[in-house]
């Protein structure tokens, strides 16, 4: 950051940093052997398609915006509680949500963002 840093650059760096944090978590989850077939975007962040495009490009995967994305976190918590309380198989309760729109990754941005992620990780993840 310097005197030339403007509001747009600052906001972009904030969003990029949050996205890198999500990518770092995604990598950790992937290393556990859990197969991540589909990735869904829910909540307030799902309203900004530019951010989702950036995140998809960092993850190098397309991302799906769900129907009723504002309610999906509460809906997911309720389904997990129902699953635990009723001792059911997860296949009976945890079905994929309805997809409103798929945001495709930008293949031209992925290599650039991977380099920037490596720099971010070098500074922030110890």
Regions of interest found by a model, annotated:
Residues 1-126:
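Glycine/Thr-rich phosphate-binding loops that ligate phosphate moieties of nucleotide
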């Amino acid at each position: 950051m310097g005197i030339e840093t403007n509001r747009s650059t600052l906001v972009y760096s904030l969003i990029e940093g949050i996205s890198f944090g999500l990518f770092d978590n995604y990598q950790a989850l992937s290393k556990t052997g859990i197969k991540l077939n589909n990735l869904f975007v829910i909540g307030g962040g799902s309203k900004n398609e530019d951010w989702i495009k950036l995140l998809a490009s960092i993850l190098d995967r397309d991302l799906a915006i769900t129907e009723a994305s504002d309610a999906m976190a509460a809906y997911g918590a309720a389904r997990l509680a129902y699953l635990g309380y009723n001792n059911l198989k997860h296949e009976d309760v945890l079905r994929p949500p309805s997809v409103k729109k798929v945001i495709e990754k930008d293949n031209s941005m992925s290599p650039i963002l991977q380099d920037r992620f490596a720099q971010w990780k070098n500074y922030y993840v110890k």
